[in-house]
Every structure is written in structure tokens, then in C-alpha cells.
């Protein structure tokens, strides 16, 4: 079934979108926004209510209230999501003539769905099975890891598993039942930053991405941000 948020904050919408994209879902954002398309020339879209679609191949399409053709689109480049000044979605347009930047003043609805027609219940169940496996055998994450809570709420969204490592350090664990991409690393970083703000400024917080595998780019991002990858697969897989 589709995932949906109504009137989310920028932080909530950013967390929702990056998490859904990391799961290979199509993301739809409806809200009041402005957009800029740059390339051979610059084109600005004035404030208005529009629909943004972020597809699994990192194509971003923006539709207005009327007409068949999109108001703007970009594809081929990495998509970045930021909530520092409202929700901003940007695509550098690696395979197109222009880069697209969309900034939402308000998001009315955020939806994520499997446009390919895969059974979303099966995906969710597989992730739940991976979570159960980690909770049953926490040492799969790393020796000495102790889970304390699941779906712990933060300003960046709920953390899959909240716990402490062998040294007692607060640890956020992000679970992916398939090979994780850069969006998963970005989401994990959001959780870590949110926990640091919630606890205290000098708190030490770790982040561990648990998935069967990660892309090369994701591995680099994790290393650059001081995050950890732990290879764990859902039950029934031939992998660890």
C-alpha cells in the first residue's frame, strides 16, 4: 500500500522522501513551491501549488494545475533533498540540458508508492523480517550492540532501531532489505544529527546502516560522514 503523510514539516517530508527513494519507490510531493531550471538559459517558476514526482531512476518531474506536459523536469543526475530552508529537492540533470531546483514553502501531501506494481506489502514484510532478525541477534549489527527501542521518533522521522554499542554510545540503526543507495546514507545522517540536537550539543551519536549491500558511492558517503555499514540480509537469503 502507498505511504502517505499529510501536512508534514519540511524535516518530516525530507526524511519521508529520502527513505522512500532508498526503498526504490516513486515519491509524490504536492504543495506550494517555486522552481528554477538552469542550463543554457534560466527559467523560474513563480510560487504555485504543484506536484513533484521523484522516480526511482532519479528523474524529477514538476506538474502544474493544468496541461499534459510538465512545467519542468530533469533526470540523470543525483537527487538531493534538504530541509534547511523549507523542503528543497534538486536534480543536477546529468543527462539533460538543465538542472532543476524546487523549494516548497509548504507540503500538503507526501506519498510514496511502487509504480512498477510490486507488492508493497511484501517489501514491508521483508524489512520487518530483517528488523526481527536484528532484534533477535543484535550481534549481527556488531558485537555488543544492544537495541533499546524501535521506531523511536525524532524530528527527522522514526529511527528503525535505537540502541547503544558495546561502549554505551547512542546508536541509530537504519535498515534496508535491499542494496542501499546514497539516500539511505543521507537519511541515517539526518537521524544522527537529530539525536545530537535532542540529547545535547556534545553528545556522541553513531549511525549504522544495516543492509545486504551498499553501492560504492554509498560506502564513500558513509565513510565521509563517520557512519558505519554492517552487511546483514533478511532471513532466507544466502548472504549473512
Curated annotation (Swiss-Prot):
Gene Ontology molecular functions: DNA binding; single-stranded DNA endodeoxyribonuclease activity
Annotated GO CC locations: cytoplasm
CDD domains reported in the protein's UniProt record: NucS-like
InterPro entries assigned: Endonuclease_NucS, NucS_C, NucS_N, NucS_N_sf, TonB_box_CS, tRNA_endonuc-like_dom_sf
Top-level EC class: hydrolase
Pfam families: NucS_C, NucS_N
Alphabetical keyword list: Cytoplasm, DNA-binding, Endonuclease, Hydrolase, Nuclease
Intracellular or extracellular location(s): Cytoplasm
EC number: 3.1.-.-
Gene3D superfamilies the record matches: 2.70.180.20, 3.40.1350.10
Functional note: Cleaves both 3' and 5' ssDNA extremities of branched DNA structures.
Family according to the record: Belongs to the NucS endonuclease family.
Record protein name field: Endonuclease NucS 1
